[in-house]
A protein has these predicted regions:
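Active-site neighborhoods and metal-handling regions in enzymes and metal-associated proteins
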Residues: 1-233
Length: 233
């Protein structure tokens, strides 16, 4: 299949943006209502219920919710663990609108978190911003992965970045191009891709920030910024 097939039309991009708008509204709702004692499963169920209420056709993948050290597993399956004050909450979610997927991850603090955790968060934040800035049409996907990976390594956390930098999003949640170190894929104008660096320290902490961008624009599709949010109840 030709690479150009994975560049998105104006209509396809509009569906992706509409889906992200729903996800943004769900995220706003969660930030406004989350309370200590809710379980990961309960929060996942609430998120998916709100997605449908706000107009989603369905979820684009099983929603990930991880509290505290559980977030050190990138594809954690929500459990009965309850939310405690002073830990991170990681949410990875997306919906389908018009047959097009969306994909979005944020990590926020529920109460005050440790200084080291904030440091890790801000490294991921800065590295993601660099990745978005450096994403250009007609570059190799692996070149973007190297930029992101090298920056995390330079900051002392390279061994804790244990997945790829990103992937294409469209009719499939994971599609061409794949932004990883062994990729031969090309980034072309109007492709929709994720930039999603993370740092995962087993048994301690996990942070991921993920946004979809349109190649050639260097802008997040989501309205949400990435400065650390601290929710206090």
């Amino acid at each position: 299949m030709s690479e150009e097939v994975f560049s998105k039309s104006v209509e396809q991009i509009s569906y992706i943006m509409k889906g992200q708008s729903i996800v943004d509204d769900v995220y706003d709702y969660i930030l406004a209502t989350i309370k200590e004692g809710i379980s990961e499963k309960e929060l996942r169920d609430l998120i998916e219920k709100k997605m449908m209420k706000f107009g989603a056709e369905k979820t684009s993948f099983p929603t990930i919710v991880a509290f505290g050290s559980n977030a050190a597993e990138p594809h954690h399956e929500p459990s009965n663990r309850k939310l405690n004050n002073g830990e991170f909450v990681l949410i990875d979610m997306g919906v389908i609108i018009g047959g097009m997927c969306s994909d979005f991850t944020r990590t926020f603090a529920f109460g005050c978190v440790a200084k080291e955790d904030k440091k890790i968060y801000n490294i991921v934040r800065r590295v993601q911003a660099l990745g978005i800035k450096k994403c250009k049409p007609n570059m190799k996907a692996r070149a973007l992965d190297k930029i992101v990976r090298d920056e995390i390594t330079k900051r002392g956390y390279g061994e804790y970045f244990i997945h790829s930098t990103g992937h294409g999003v469209g009719t499939e949640i994971h599609e061409y191009p794949f932004i990883r170190k062994d990729s031969e894929d090309m980034l072309l104008k109007d492709m929709v891709v994720t930039v999603e660096p993370g740092i995962y320290i087993e048994g301690k902490v996990g942070v991921r920030i993920e946004d979809m961008i349109i190649v050639g624009t260097n802008k997040r599709i989501s309205k949400h910024k990435t400065k650390l949010i601290i929710v206090k109840r």
